[in-house]
Regions:
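Mature extracytoplasmic/luminal segments of secretory-pathway proteins
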Residues: 34-36, 41-43, 54, 157, ...
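Detector for glycine-centered tight turns/loop "hinges" at secondary-structure junctions
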Residues: 81-83, 166, 173, 200
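Short amphipathic alpha-helical "interface-anchor" segments enriched in bulky aromatics
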Residues: 156-185, 220-266
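Long, low-complexity, polar/charged, intrinsically disordered or flexibly structured peripheral segments
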Residues: 189-230
């Protein structure tokens, strides 16, 4: 577990970078039970003995089908060399990944009280405002992909709108250029791409009379989900997000290499 990996010097629990992801674990085609009575009625309401009372029906969005079993939520050390698992937890199959994160994270903290999470990497299924707020309260950097169904392309101010990647766009529809971050005021600075002399960009539309061009200041506190630190268009964000697949590889190792679904499951 996490403590053993710490003793071996494989992970650093004091500065832990977590990647989380859930995957389906099929245990049976239906709910398995045996009757405890001698009733002749097939659909009697007498008590039954269930071999897996904590399983239910879930939906596999990648294969577009329902299944019966568990949802395995895996938390891995994203900054480890071998995608080491920190804390896996079997939840009900019907549990969404955003809820699975909450259950697994707090269960992990109960077992690994010394774990200090500094950063967490998640896919778009976790693109929920409450998760960003929780991470901010606990000083955790949240690297989460945007979910377009949550609403991202919208008019934010009279002078600019927000594009699908969370970056401001000017009235001409051009993506503005990030020009720094003010830590004291907690806001990003964006400038006109035409005035900034970006390659391949030419615009005849004048958004500002200033020779400096249109400047937009975006406070991150206005919308933690859209305006992240680091910004989603930065190299830092992309490099960190690439580590997220460690949880997917760890799930594959559990399901395929160790044949988790082939075992006889009983809870």
């Amino acid at each position: 577990d996490g403590r053993e990996f710490k003793k071996l010097g494989l992970i650093d629990l004091e500065k832990l970078v977590l990647a989380g992801d859930g995957t389906e674990v099929v245990t049976s085609a239906r709910n398995r039970y045996r009757k405890l009575c001698n009733c002749t009625d097939h659909n009697c309401s007498c008590n039954r003995w269930y071999s897996q009372p904590d399983t239910d029906c879930g939906y596999d969005s990648s294969r577009h089908k329902f299944y019966y079993g568990y949802d395995l939520y895996m938390m891995t050390a994203a900054d480890s060399e071998n995608d080491l698992p920190v804390f896996p937890l079997l939840n009900r199959a019907s549990m969404h990944d955003s809820f699975g994160l909450c259950y697994t994270y707090h269960a992990m903290k109960a077992f690994l009280k010394e774990a200090n999470v500094t950063e967490i990497l998640l896919d778009s299924a976790h693109d929920v405002m409450a998760i960003y707020q929780f991470c901010q309260r606990n000083s955790i950097t949240a690297i989460i992909d945007l979910n377009e169904r949550g609403g991202i392309n919208f008019k934010y101010k009279d002078t600019y709108s927000i594009g699908k990647d969370g970056i401001p766009m000017c009235q001409a529809g051009l993506k503005m250029i990030r020009d720094g971050y003010e830590k004291k005021r907690m806001r990003y600075k964006f400038r006109c791409p035409n005035v900034y002399h970006c390659d391949g960009i030419h615009c005849e539309h004048t958004c500002s009379d200033s020779p400096y061009g249109l400047v937009v200041h975006v406070p991150t506190k206005e919308n933690l989900r859209i305006f992240t630190v680091p910004s989603r268009d930065s190299k830092e964000w992309k490099l960190e997000y690439n580590k997220r697949t460690s949880s997917e590889r760890c799930n594959k190792r559990e399901k395929i290499d160790y044949q988790l679904e082939s075992g006889r499951h009983q809870s």
